[in-house]
Design a protein with these regions (language model features):
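Ser/Thr-rich, low-complexity intrinsically disordered terminal regions
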Residues: 22-27, 31, 35-125, 129-130
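Bacterial N-terminal signal peptides that target proteins for export
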Residues: 1-10
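N-terminal signal peptide c-region/cleavage motif recognized by signal peptidases
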Residues: 16-18
Length: 131
C-alpha cells in the first residue's frame, strides 16, 4: 500500500467519522525537510503543551506518529503524523474527543498549533496559559 493510498483511506475514514460525531479537528502543519525533524518537533510540541497546560496522560510513539493522550482529562487526545510526501515530511495534526465538548477540543488544537508554529519560527518560547 502506498503512502498516498493510506492517507486517502485515513482521510475518508476521518470524514466519515466527522459526519457521525463532530469530535475531530484536522490541521495541516506545513512541511519539513525530514521525518526526524518532524518527529522531534512533534514530541517537543506535546511536551510543551503538557508543561504549560498540564495533563496527566502519556505520549505514544511510532516510526512516524506522536500521540499525546489525555490532554484534557481522559477525553481529548492528539496525534501528530509525519508522513513523507514528495520527499518532504508533510505533518498534520488530528485532535479528537470522546465526549461532546467540541469547544475544548478546538482549544486544545489551537494551543498545539500555536506551539508548533512558535517552534517553526525559532521562537522556542512556550506560550503562557490563557483561559
Amino acid at each position: 500500500m502506498t503512502l498516498r493510498a493510506f492517507l486517502s483511506g485515513l482521510g475518508l475514514s476521518v470524514l466519515a467519522t466527522m459526519a457521525q460525531a463532530e469530535g475531530w479537528t484536522v490541521s495541516d502543519l506545513g512541511s519539513l525537510d525530514t521525518r526526524e525533524e518532524c518527529m522531534r518537533r512533534a514530541e517537543a510540541t506535546i511536551d510543551s503543551y503538557r508543561a504549560v497546560y498540564g495533563g496527566s496522560g502519556f505520549t505514544g510513539r511510532s516510526e512516524w506518529t506522536i500521540g499525546g493522550y489525555d490532554l484534557r482529562g481522559d477525553v481529548v487526545d492528539a496525534l501528530i503524523i509525519c508522513p513523507i510526501e514528495a520527499g518532504l515530511a508533510a505533518p498534520f495534526l488530528i485532535v479528537f474527543n470522546s465526549d461532546s465538548d467540541n469547544d475544548a477540543r478546538g482549544l486544545v488544537a489551537e494551543r498545539l498549533e500555536e506551539i508548533w508554529d512558535q517552534q517553526l519560527a525559532g521562537d522556542g518560547a512556550v506560550p503562557s496559559e490563557t483561559k
